[in-house]
Amino acid sequence: MARFSTSNILGDPFALATISISILAWLISFIGSIIANVQTDFPNYVWWAVAYMICVITGIIIVTGSDTSLTYGNAITGYLSAGLVFTTLAVNSLVYQPQSSKQAAAAGFILLSMVIIIWIFYFGSTPQASHRRTIDSFALNKEGKSYQNSRPQSNGFGTRPGTTVSQPPQMYTSAQLNGFETSSPMSGYPGGPPGSDKRNTTATNFPTGGNVDSSNEVSQPTEYPYKAKAIYSYDANPDDANEISFAKGEELEVSDVSGRWWQARRANGETGIAPSNYLILL
């Protein structure tokens, strides 16, 4: 699981509001249950609902803080559905009682049920759902946010595999590129990316045309040990022949899962690099 960070909760208004309300509602139901249990007979079943819901709330805090809601969304929806049944039955057992402590506990469970319904609608929907996209747009850090919005405007070559200063950029033959080749080793930038003339002079220089020395050519990986599934559709940048397009739900073979760009191969044999935040490992 990814590292837990409180900024994922504090930077997400939806998560911060719903988690805060759920904790408050649970405290009301818990304290009301304790008082009611001291004053009069109290249904033991309600304690199970109290214990179950604190576990569910804790799980949602962990998943939200680690930004893995896409990975565990189905499991969360299942647990929340069971929790909705438990809280509803607890309300039915308490709300009609004359004791104010039981009614207070019932009010806490009613508020919990309302939050659970909202959570089910959120976690049970796909990331492409309009309401979820709207909610996620307010979050500062969110898994699966559009890569196009986070792509650097100046130069993004530094994060791609095989394009650092210390090693030659990744090369492809004409047969591998299927007619998408360009005359520049760095696609879209004749003579290299902007500012390349100011880089370390010890870096390898590449010709802008003609024959390229085969010793500088980086061979494509022969093994693709990982399987990944596309959670979004992606259209390759037409100015970069190294990228590949794929559709949502398509399964790809991946050779390396380090970095923001993964070397991938489609079912039709097409190879190239794909943004990692558009894929999920199987």
Curated annotation (Swiss-Prot):
TM stretches of this protein: 15-35, 45-65, 75-95, 104-124
Domain of life per record: Eukaryota
Ranges facing Cytoplasmic side: 1-14, 66-74, 125-282
Protein purpose: Plasma membrane osmosensor that activates the high osmolarity glycerol (HOG) MAPK signaling pathway in response to high osmolarity.
Residue intervals of the SH3 domain: 223-282
Similarity comment text for this entry: Belongs to the SHO1 family.
Residue ranges, Extracellular side: 36-44, 96-103
GO biological process, one term: regulation of actin filament polymerization
InterPro entries associated with the record: SH3-like_dom_sf (IPR036028), SH3_domain (IPR001452), Sho1_SH3 (IPR035522)
Protein name stated in the entry: High osmolarity signaling protein sho1
Keyword flag Transmembrane helix: yes
Quaternary structure and partners: Forms homooligomers.
PANTHER family cross-referenced by the UniProt entry: FCH AND DOUBLE SH3 DOMAINS PROTEIN, HIGH OSMOLARITY SIGNALING PROTEIN SHO1
Alphabetically ordered keywords of this record: Cell membrane, Membrane, SH3 domain, Stress response, Transmembrane, Transmembrane helix
Cellular compartments annotated: Cell membrane
Residue span of region Disordered: 144-220
Gene field: sho1
Extent of Polar residues compositional bias: 146-182, 201-220
Pfam families associated with the record: SH3_1
Native source organism of the sequence: Talaromyces marneffei (strain ATCC 18224 / CBS 334.59 / QM 7333) (Penicillium marneffei)
SMART domains given in the database record: SH3 (SM00326)
An example Gene Ontology CC term for this record: plasma membrane
UniProt topology in membrane: Multi-pass membrane protein
